């Protein structure tokens, strides 16, 4: 039996308030104080992860800090708390630890955390990229668009996931607008990729203006708050929101939204897990499905590949190819489209496509 663990943490205080009615009556400042001082803990025992080649069990381990706290508290304090969480995984018998959400971007993106633990560590970003691009390609096709002729915007292009998406898509699309807060890293990336594929490049630090012409948007920044609003998007746009917390305003993807019912927003990396998996914890997905970052941890465990796989901010296409091959071997696959915990049906996509055609 292979063994893994994965770190969860509350993305916001609202997450905590949804879990417990009692918490709703606790003032925000007091709740932040409680979370800052609460020790990491075991969330649940995961069973039933089974491929034709191996079987695994695992654990969700909880780091109580919110995304906002991980950004604002001293880096050393946050890393110490994540390492404490990892030590629980070690004690449980896990041989590899996946870093969820903001735990994968603090400091040097997992390198220091891995150095301080006695088990392998991965951020899950390789499979996150692979499945985000797979989902984007399929969603673009269903919306009647030719990805080869599309203008793509990558929000958060200077980060590890964003730059990896740019490297892969540079061989597949016509134009890529690289968007992030700082222009310098974007210009370096554009210069590196220019001429490697068919795509031309532009760079921007202004998200609103950078999105108006985009047929396809991949949102991968680590912003704590929403940064994309309905008015920013082109009619008929396909938006893949990979980041946690989500980059796309709930107004965009609320069912049958009166504001923008002509835009398709999908969550990146919703994965079907082989076997009869029971997570014993509800994170808003249908049974037997999970985030791609969680899936990468399970895939590596099933393969017995207990090594630091995806760490740091340089994500290589070869890593993405490797994890994609292992995922296929063990029976992991994209589990359709979802947004804000709701399934997106073919009928819904056709309606969005129809609305976009009417607005032209």
Model-derived features with residue positions:
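Adenosine-phosphate binding glycine-rich loop
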Residues: 2, 6-12, 17-57, 64-67, ...
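Conserved acidic residues
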Residues: 3-5, 95, 174, 215, ...
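Glycine/serine-rich phosphate-binding loop and adjoining beta1-alpha1 elements at the start
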Residues: 48-147, 279-288, 295
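Short, ordered loop/turn segments at secondary-structure junctions
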Residues: 101-104, 126-127, 181, 244, ...
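Short, charged/polar "capping" segments at the starts of alpha-helices
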Residues: 104-108, 183-188, 247-250
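Short glycine/serine/threonine-rich phosphate/pyrophosphate-binding segments
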Residues: 129, 159-165, 225-227
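Glycine-rich phosphate/diphosphate-binding loop of Rossmann-like nucleotide-binding domains
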Residues: 138-216
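Rossmann-like adenosine-cofactor binding region
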Residues: 198-273
């Amino acid at each position: 039996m292979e063994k893994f663990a994965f770190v969860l943490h509350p993305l916001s205080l609202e997450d905590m308030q949804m879990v417990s009615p009692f918490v709703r009556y606790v003032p925000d400042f007091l709740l932040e104080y409680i979370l800052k001082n609460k020790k990491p803990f075991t969330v649940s025992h995961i069973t039933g992860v089974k491929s034709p080649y191996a079987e695994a069990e695992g654990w969700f381990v909880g780091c109580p800090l919110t995304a906002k706290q991980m950004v604002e508290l001293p880096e050393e304090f946050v890393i110490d708390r994540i390492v404490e969480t990892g030590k629980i995984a070690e004690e449980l018998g896990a041989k590899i630890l996946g870093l969820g959400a903001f735990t994968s971007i603090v400091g040097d993106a997992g390198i220091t955390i891995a150095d301080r633990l006695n088990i392998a560590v991965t951020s899950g970003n390789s499979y996150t990229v692979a499945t985000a691009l797979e989902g984007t390609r399929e969603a673009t096709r269903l919306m009647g668009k030719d990805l080869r002729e599309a203008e793509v915007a990558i929000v958060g292009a200077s980060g590890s996931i964003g730059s990896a998406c740019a490297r892969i898509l540079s061989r597949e699309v016509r134009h890529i607008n690289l968007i992030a807060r700082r222009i310098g890293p974007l210009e370096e990336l554009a210069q590196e990729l220019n001429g490697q594929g068919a795509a031309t490049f532009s760079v921007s630090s202004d998200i609103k203006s950078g999105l108006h012409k985009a047929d396809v948007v991949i949102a991968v920044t680590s912003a704590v708050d929403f940064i994309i609003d309905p008015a920013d998007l082109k009619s008929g746009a396909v938006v893949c929101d990979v980041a946690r917390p989500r980059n796309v305003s709930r107004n965009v993807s609320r069912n049958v939204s009166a504001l923008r019912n002509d835009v398709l927003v999908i969550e990146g990396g919703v994965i079907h897990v082989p076997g009869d998996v029971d997570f014993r914890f509800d994170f808003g997905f249908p049974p037997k499905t999970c985030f791609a970052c969680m899936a990468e941890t399970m895939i590596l465990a099933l393969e017995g590949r207990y090594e630091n796989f995806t760490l740091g901010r340089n994500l290589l296409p070869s890593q993405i190819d490797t994890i994609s091959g292992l995922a296929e071997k063990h029976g992991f696959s994209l589990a359709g489209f979802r947004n804000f915990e709701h399934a997106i049906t073919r009928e819904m996509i056709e309606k969005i496509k129809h609305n976009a055609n009417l607005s032209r």
